[in-house]
Amino acid sequence: MAEADAAVAKAEAANAQADLSSSEALIAHLKLEIAKLRREIYGTRSERKARLLEQMELRLEDLEAAATEDELVAEKAAARTQTIQSFQRKRPSRKPFPDHLLRERIVIAAPESCPCCGSAKLSKLGEDITETLEVIPRQWKVIQTVREKFSCRECEKIMQPPAPFHVTPRGFAGPNLLAMILFEKFGQHQPLNRQSERYRREGIDLSVSTLADQVGACTTALRPLHALIERHVLAAERLHGDDTTVPILAKGKTVTGRIWTYVRDDRPFGGHAPPAALYYASRDRKHEHPVQHLQAFTGILQADAYSGYNELYDPSRSQGAITAALCWAHARRQFFELADIAANARRGKNAAAISPVALAAVKRIDALFDIERDINGLSTEERLRVRQEQSAPLLAALEAWLREEHSRLSRSASVAQPIDYMLRRWDRFARFIEDGRVCLTNNAAERALRGFALGRKSWLFAGSERGADRAAAMTTLIMTAKLNDVDPQAWLADVLARIANIPQSRLPELLPWHWAAEMEHRKVAA
């Protein structure tokens, strides 16, 4: 009797724990969905929200795993009793498996006789189908292209078709394999040594030097497309520019190099030109690099306040001065850090006082962002009209308020620095009031550099300056494909298979936006 009571108590406790874990997981799931929906509807107002979403997703993973563990414990405990029913967890509904997935039908053999009376007179009433998602391990194959030799009995001439084309000299790899190697290295940030190890576990011995040989040859083969994308980007009316660090090995030591990006995206002001991202690498951050990169560009450059761009804004520039526009998200971030109540609370004893001025500045800047969300994607003229009517009064009030607060504050006040940063560059911050093409933020360029931030964690450094150049060139291709909603690996595979045989005049057909249209046309025709 005591054992039965103990089993019941244990089962009840297990059910309670499973119920609690399930509730926590469900709450976390719903909070995450709400946060994602708010982000889609209202846009991203701060980097902190992006980080918060990542933290919520990680927390949800742990809670889901814990809830499943507790549910299984409750099932086992309930099975040892006759009075306790096992806890049944309420899970968020799962999406059905996509229709395009291959279905393998396995029919369980029908019974030959009735298990109740033994009769063989059975008739089928219907069927129930249980679907199980499974993965097929990657398949490798060797394609043997047979070239038969023939001789002419009249003139004894020997004939044989030419050898099949390979993308790379001394080539042995097909375009799909090459595309996978390139995308995993430059799109998924998997170094060649890790790829080589994984292939070896799958029974394929491809050394790092062999893979590197293929990568170098593919980069050379794809250079013409990189040149076309470069020309397309630099022909833009407005560019987003930014840079980030990348460690580069150089003669036994590591130097802090830079990756520069210039993003063309006309969609916010209703432009129809395809978006594209251009990358360059350098061993330092000297001003000569952006000057060289943008020597053929004339238009608007949205960037940070890096002094290396100043030569581009010089009215005496031979190609014509580039118009500077600064990023409001960058300015807002400086105020937000002084007004972040949650972050301040986490500092505990080291917390600094929340700045009321910074908090007020964030609210005033957010009012401008609210207007921008409503005009995103409208024409240049319509955006300018709304800004003149709605944003201009707010901007004038913000400038007057900042100047008044700046005159009151001590130079040592923490909030004085971001105010001074804005006021000394006010004409560049106010550029969006004069031109509907200007965006309020430089987020397009910052997003384009996130891959390199992730890459630094994976591959730590670029192996050489040429390696950094190669990474910049390949990332140009991959990111441009992504910006046009094109699968980079599928695109690279098709391009590598065709690029050697296509005339120079038709190379633009292989650009991601033209390629996507061609694939869609083929799909419709089929």
What spans do the regions from the language model cover?
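Catalytic center-proximal scaffold of phosphoryl-transfer enzymes
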Residues: 28, 50, 64, 69, ...
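Short, flexible loop/hinge motifs at secondary-structure junctions
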Residues: 1-169, 240-241, 269-273, 303
